[in-house]
């Protein structure tokens, strides 16, 4: 998804959004220094830009996920009874997703996870089976509160129903973009003190999605501070450190300036943070 990041940088520059440009530059500076930072952390700025340019498509955090989508064969869970497409199944899924979209219904999310796992067990085509396994993993994550329950996860849940409708009519094509979005949320899940649910664990393992630290795509992580103030703060800290070292070495002439320098550092932190 490198082209998405380039697009973000160009849009920010064209629209003359200083905070956005600062965020992109700060992110790129960290990458060049070898810091482990996800481009998804630029999502708040990216979303603002997309809103300003009047994009017809909703901004999605997975737009910035640096993954090129490829289908992997994710086997169905062992011991899960196969479930066939049927009007009664669609009615069950409609009700469950509606409750999920209303928020806070972990039982309905788990029901969707179970039904999706059953659909996966009934598929003979690898992509269809993998899709339903990813859907099962996605709903397991919602059921256990392993990633945010927000407008993006709710939209994804409703899109699963549209994909079901298409596949139940005999259309074997599966949306790459929907699978990518669902897998993105699966990548956010961290087990904490408990064990990862089965479908989610399998999807994370096969796609290599497990992470060591959480990712907050709604929280601004870059461009929060004025670069000029940050530079001034660094200079003041360096000057205060030099004075302190001199005092420790017995240079009492620095006593007159040490209080002023530390006060300046304190002021910098007040305005910067």
What are these regions (language model features)?
Residues 3-83, 145-226:
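Structural secondary-structure packing elements that flank or coincide with functional cores
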Residues 60-110, 213-257:
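Long, amphipathic alpha-helical coiled-coil segments characteristic
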Residues 92, 96, 115, 134-137, ...:
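Charge-rich, solvent-exposed alpha-helical interaction surfaces
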Residues 5, 31, 96-104, 123, ...:
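Secondary-structure edge/capping motif, primarily at the C-terminal ends of alpha-helices
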């Amino acid at each position: 998804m490198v082209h998405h990041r380039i697009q973000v940088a160009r849009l920010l520059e064209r629209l003359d959004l200083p905070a956005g440009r600062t965020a992109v530059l700060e992110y790129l500076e960290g990458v060049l220094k070898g810091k482990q930072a996800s481009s998804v952390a630029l999502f708040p700025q990216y979303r603002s830009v997309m809103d300003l340019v009047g994009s017809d498509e909703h901004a999605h955090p997975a737009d910035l996920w640096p993954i090129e989508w490829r289908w992997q064969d994710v086997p169905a869970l062992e011991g899960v009874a196969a479930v066939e497409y049927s009007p009664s199944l669609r009615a069950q899924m409609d009700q469950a997703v509606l409750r999920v979209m209303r928020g806070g219904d972990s039982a309905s999310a788990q029901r969707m996870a179970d039904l999706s796992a059953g659909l996966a067990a009934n598929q003979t085509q690898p992509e269809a089976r993998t899709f339903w396994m990813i859907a099962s993993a996605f709903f397991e994550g919602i059921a256990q509160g392993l990633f945010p329950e927000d407008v993006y996860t709710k939209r994804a849940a409703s899109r699963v129903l549209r994909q079901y409708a298409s596949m139940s009519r005999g259309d074997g094509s599966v949306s790459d973009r929907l699978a990518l979005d669902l897998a993105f949320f699966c990548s956010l899940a961290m087990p904490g003190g408990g064990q990862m649910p089965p479908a989610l664990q399998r999807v994370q393992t096969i796609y290599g999605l497990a992470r060591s630290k959480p990712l907050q795509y709604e929280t601004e992580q870059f461009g929060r501070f004025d670069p000029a103030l940050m530079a001034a703060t660094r200079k003041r800290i360096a000057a205060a450190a030099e004075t302190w070292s001199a005092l420790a070495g017995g240079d009492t002439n620095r006593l007159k300036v040490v209080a002023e320098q530390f006060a300046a550092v304190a002021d910098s932190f007040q305005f910067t943070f």
